[in-house]
Amino acid sequence: FPTRRSSDLGSLLQSIATITTLERLGHKCEIIDYIRDDEHGLSAVKTNLNNKQRWSGNSLKKLAYIVLRYPEEKKAELNFREMRRKYLKLTQLCRTHDDLKRLDADIFMTGSDQVWGPTLNGHYDEAYFLSFVKDKRKIAYAASLGRTDFTAKILSEYKKLLSSYSGIAVRENTAVGLLRQMDIECAGQVLDPTLLLTGDEWSRMIKKDMGGKYVLVYQLHNNPALSKYAVRFAEHVGLPLYRVSPTFHQIRRGGKFIYLPDLPDFLSYIKNSTYFITDSFHGTAFALNFNRQFIEILPNNKTGNRNQSILQLTRLQDRIVTDYADCSISERMIDYERVNDILRKERIRSLGILKQLLRQ
């Protein structure tokens, strides 16, 4: 089952959780190691540049962007390649649909993390719809479209691609509605794989606890207001601010900078934080797993429904901050007895749906 091969800690942890869950259910599985030519190295930087209006004004600006970002992109790519090899069971490297067609399995499964959303170039990739699979069963667990604003033409194309699946369960409640709109049968909304494992289970991966009290920020999107709010919030509660990031350019955004930690340390920073500020779906998921007092800043793009969906499920919409002058959320503690009860029931329900998909 393919997962987006991005330099993203959450995606990597989601893949680990999926493998762990399937193996516990008695299955052997591998992650399809698929990499698009335009999503790595210099090509990824150039593709990203097309979406950066600030840098695309003239040739000099474009060159400056490439010179600044390429070394960072290359380093992150090498680090994540090493982590994928360390933590995941991978197939052979696949770069084309012909490579994908040579793979063999009893069941092909689409994973999570915006697999059915746009790629870096703004278009969807049929590989993530398992279009290369012709005579084997196809299922999807916690598949994510990432957004909701699809044209009628795109939805029509999606319907053709999804009609060959024998079973589908999705991660967001909005995706359930979109599938119904396409007349595609859906088993329902399920938990992201990272939430199928408990905080105690994830803690076994941690090698050392981070000492002291601190505010942690994990930010994926370019949002200056979030960066300023994190600094203001840390000052308000009188604690140091730590910033963990897989991208080096965030060093300018405030706080003690922790660049691309290994997964055990990344989890430890979240687990041991006093407060946790994030715009990341998987950041939110691990805040829930570790029962952290978190503050949610919704992404300033079209993918915020991912975060909103899990907050609605756990009835924690009040953790969303929109007034960046207001730090009073620091005084409102989350009732994790209630939240953990919701997650416990949802784990049981989601695992039941996954077992059903595998049996169909």
Spell out what each predicted region is:
Residues 1-6:
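Short, small-residue-biased leader/transition segments that mark boundaries at the very start
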Residues 187-195, 199, 246-247, 251-279:
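Donor nucleotide-activated moiety binding/catalytic core segment of transferases
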Residues 269-309:
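A donor-sugar binding/catalytic signature common to diverse glycosyltransferases
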Residues 32-107:
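Active-site donor-binding segments of glycosyltransferases and PAPS-dependent sulfotransferases
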Residues 152-167:
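Membrane-proximal helix-turn-helix segments that form the acceptor-binding/catalytic region
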Residues 139-146, 178, 219-221, 225-262, ...:
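Catalytic donor nucleotide-activated moiety binding site of glycosyltransferases and closely related
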Residues 312-360:
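Leloir-type glycosyltransferase catalytic cores
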Residues 165-172, 277:
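A short beta-strand/loop micro-motif in the catalytic core of glycosyltransferases
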